[in-house]
Amino acid sequence: MRSAQVYRWQIPMDAGVVLRDRRLKTRDGLYVCLRDGEREGWGEISPLPGFSQETWEEAQTALLTWVNDWLQGSEGLPEMPSVAFGASCALAELTGVLPEAADYRAAPLCTGDPDDLVLRLADMPGEKIAKVKVGLYEAVRDGMVVNLLLEAIPDLHLRLDANRAWTPLKAQQFAKYVNPDYRARIAFLEEPCKTRDDSRAFARETGIAIAWDESLREADFTFEAEEGVRAVVIKPTLTGSLDKVREQVAAAHALGLTAVISSSIESSLGLTQLARIAAWLTPGTLPGLDTLHLMQAQQVRPWPGSALPCLKRDELERLL
């Protein structure tokens, strides 16, 4: 016998969270909980403002329609990426497809203070990997910060994310301030320039490896092995169903590319599921999930070791 609940929620964010020039004051989303007999499965639907095509309200309408269809016996999935991902996760939990084992390691997001990063990395098992957002300030400053970190921590590898912020000139200004001897320890730089061709040229000219992120969601993107391209960053909330995520990971691995499962600032419930997906589909690759500290609370399922308060399901607004 099938049954379902849908919950709506809103989590206050830390004051300094800015996405594409807009301050994110709250993180808004939905949960779906599916039951079939004794089995239960949860999924999170939380479109990311400025990145998702669908709004939270559109996702809610699509989710409620899909849940009603599922209760009638339908087996399809919604079209909207965030709804397709959340619904497919709930189904994967319900049917036992999504393994319980999780990779709760996370590449720490660094604000540029090497002393703070040394402390955070001290307890990290295995290779030392951190992530730095670049492109928010002057490119020269970014280059100096990255160089400082790589110089201060000799076994550090950095993942950098520019979100297509730079012109070719700005990208070159950044590279100029990174010692060529350190560049091999930049694991990859996500989407440095506004166009893929400019990003490819940057990789060739500087020897700094790049990764595709936004490109994966463009209609003309195809997976190819290219000079200077080392990785793809997959954000499931922006990608679609779990099957689509698996297809993208498989396509990347077939070409020898690293596939990184990455957060779209999901709640703790969604992040714990992403940690399970990462352990399942990209074992051995550190996922990019260090975003919980941007929020003021957890919900339903806590992240191991987090001191943030965790709301229970009966504290959420129920829609169905």
Swiss-Prot record:
Its EC number is 4.2.1.113. InterPro entries: Enolase-like_C_sf, Enolase-like_N, Enolase_C-like, Mandelate_racemase_C, OSB_synthase_MenC1, OSBS_N. The keyword Cell cycle does not apply. Converts 2-succinyl-6-hydroxy-2,4-cyclohexadiene-1-carboxylate (SHCHC) to 2-succinylbenzoate (OSB). Pathway: Quinol/quinone metabolism; 1,4-dihydroxy-2-naphthoate biosynthesis; 1,4-dihydroxy-2-naphthoate from chorismate: step 4/7; Quinol/quinone metabolism; menaquinone biosynthesis. Belongs to the mandelate racemase/muconate lactonizing enzyme family. MenC type 1 subfamily. It comes from Salmonella enteritidis PT4 (strain P125109). It catalyses: (1R,6R)-6-hydroxy-2-succinyl-cyclohexa-2,4-diene-1-carboxylate = 2-succinylbenzoate + H2O. This is o-succinylbenzoate synthase. Its cofactor is a divalent metal cation. Keywords: Lyase, Magnesium, Menaquinone biosynthesis, Metal-binding.
